[in-house]
Amino acid sequence: MPVSNAQLTQMFEHVLKLSRVDETQSVAVLKSHYSDPRTVNAAMEAAQRLKAKVYAVELPAFNHPTAMGNDMTAYCGDTALTGNLAAQRALEAADLVVDTMMLLHSPEQEQILKTGTRILLAVEPPEVLARMLPTEDDKRRVLAAETLLKQARSLHVRSKAGSDFHAPLGQYPAVTEYGYADEPGRWDHWPSGFLFTWPNEDSAEGTLVLDVGDIILPFKNYCRERITLEIEKGFITGIHGGFEAEYLRDYMKYFNDPEVYGISHIGWGLQPRAQWTAMGLHDRNDGMCMDARAFYGNFLFSTGPNTEVGGKRKTPCHLDIPLRNCDIYLDDKAVVLAGDVVAPEESRAR
């Protein structure tokens, strides 16, 4: 249902407070012509209500010739900030950047974060922002799960659909998303509520089966037939099935880069207010579909780049694929069974 401008501003005030914005802070709102003007205005007004020093940085849109579609998660690499050092410095000068245009997976974002500036991404429709308004309890549950993930040295996924996937861990850090940026150098995304890490380089092995009803992003469609992925030494080596498997093969082949087949981040969803069904109620250009990435008990894996944590794969093609009804084990300890979070107890929704 529609969210009023007043409610949207109140929501931003809540999230900015969680992000430790007050009269001592400066807030930059990063925008472009395609940013939701209501989101931009609400962020500006909320920051002013909190007596922060607020300013806007507006950049022109950027489209790479190889990018397909309007979903900005589909292409990784250059952004409107690439080569624009003056704009980058203006963002680095802020304590918090509210990103309404999306710098994700860009080297400039990593450089900004290294200065201690915090970044909060907010690009979903207001109705989605309202339903998944972050809470301190979201953070508590995600951090409880992070404790286990940081200690784990292996992740194993199984499902009745046929998935049987193993990934050695430890080379890369665990990353949390709980919806607000409250620590120096932290990037987060409102809405969210999940965690992930990356397999050790060239090590993931096994089979992942996309069952009927599972989701491929950025295609933003529900699978209507099974797709089987064979994985060897960290890379997808086979994509089997019917038309949808053929479509996926053709899409990835288009980028003409063997790195697109690498398994990237892997983790699970912890957000009970995110809904697997929500994507079917939105147009494809409505947003990023964070419901799919965050819904409670999913197994979320991605393909493509891992440079954001110091990996060696820099490639433009990025897929996020959340699976339902999986069993997930860390060092043989179950954390998700049949799509339901079972451990740690502190991470479960009540």
From Swiss-Prot:
Gene name of the encoded protein: nicX
Enzyme superclass (EC): oxidoreductase
Protein name per UniProt: 2,5-dihydroxypyridine 5,6-dioxygenase
InterPro entries in the record: M29_Exopeptidase
SUPFAM superfamilies named among the record's database cross-references: Thermophilic metalloprotease-like
Keyword line: Aromatic hydrocarbons catabolism, Iron, Metal-binding, Oxidoreductase
Gene Ontology BP terms: nicotinate catabolic process
GO MF annotation terms: 2,5-dihydroxypyridine 5,6-dioxygenase activity; metal ion binding
Cofactor section: Fe(2+)
Signal peptide: none
EC number: 1.13.11.9
Binding site for Fe cation: H265, H318, D320
Disulfide-bond pairs as recorded: none
Domain of life of the native organism: Bacteria
Pathway assigned in UniProt: Cofactor degradation; nicotinate degradation
Organism: Pseudomonas putida (strain ATCC 47054 / DSM 6125 / CFBP 8728 / NCIMB 11950 / KT2440)
Protein's job: Catalyzes the dioxygenolytic ring cleavage of 2,5-dihydroxypyridine between carbons 5 and 6 generating N-formylmaleamate in the aerobic nicotinate degradation pathway.
Reactions catalysed, as given in the entry: 2,5-dihydroxypyridine + O2 = N-formylmaleamate + H(+)
UniProt note: phenotype after gene disruption: Cells lack 2,5-dihydroxypyridine 5,6-dioxygenase activity.
